[in-house]
Amino acid sequence: LEAYVEDAFANTVSESNLQKRNERISKVFSYLGNQNNPPDIILKAGDAIEVKKIQSKGAAIALNSSYPKNKLHSDDSKITDACRDCEDWTTKDIIYAIGVTSDKNLKHLWLVYGDCYAASRNIYTRIGKTIKEGVKEIEDIEFSETKELGRVNRVDPLGITNLRIRGM
């Protein structure tokens, strides 16, 4: 699905020559991401694109421990340095490209701007901060700061189990 979205934005859907496709891709996009960090793609001097695959129209969108974004911010801890440095920017509009797929067939594709889909980031960060503070108030626990919401270490009597506190 991600390659199809790249091809759709780069106008290379019917390009069979891989070298020509790659040249066009490098002209159109300033950043091609990875599976672990948002976004998947950034258009040069343009919007960020996050590709999401679902199996049916009513399925939930997996956000991989990250809250939905109404905008992409360069100070977001979830993005990579390569993304942050791909061009000079502080805030970008983000497009969610949501595809309904079955095996290798694309049934539906929606393009939804983040500001039509998600609340502002302070809504999500406020909730995350409140959860962290609440967990820290529990007596006799060892709380660790992580890139996620946090971790409680040694939750069992043997001290061998940790509880990861993750976002969405």
Please name every model-derived segment.
Residues 1-47, 53-168:
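Nucleic-acid endonuclease domains
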